[in-house]
């Protein structure tokens, strides 16, 4: 057998073995949601005025969105100058900087303002997934 064919078989074996492992660990919607929540919590640990416990109320003042994009674009703005009471300004800043860094604008500032203290968790979750996809390989 040629070495090329041998390498192809080795690669196929790796794929087959990895699929056996992944099939043993079934991902369901709740485990995916929990994993993304943990990813965000780890990235935002230590940010003032940011406490991530869910994909709804934790994001209502815009500070979490600002912290998340600031984590990956720290030179874009001074996080310390932000005020949780300035919701509109926080959303505008976070969404603008996120878009400049490759995150699709899936949320609208006016919608977030209208949702008040309890944004739709599915909307926030979907938007935060975009951050994960864009920045998952960053330390």
Regions found by a protein language model. Give the residues of each.
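Active-site nucleotide-donor binding segment shared across nucleotidyl transfer reactions
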Residues: 61
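Long, intrinsically disordered low-complexity tracts enriched in Pro/Ser with mixed acidic/basic residues
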Residues: 1-58, 67-139
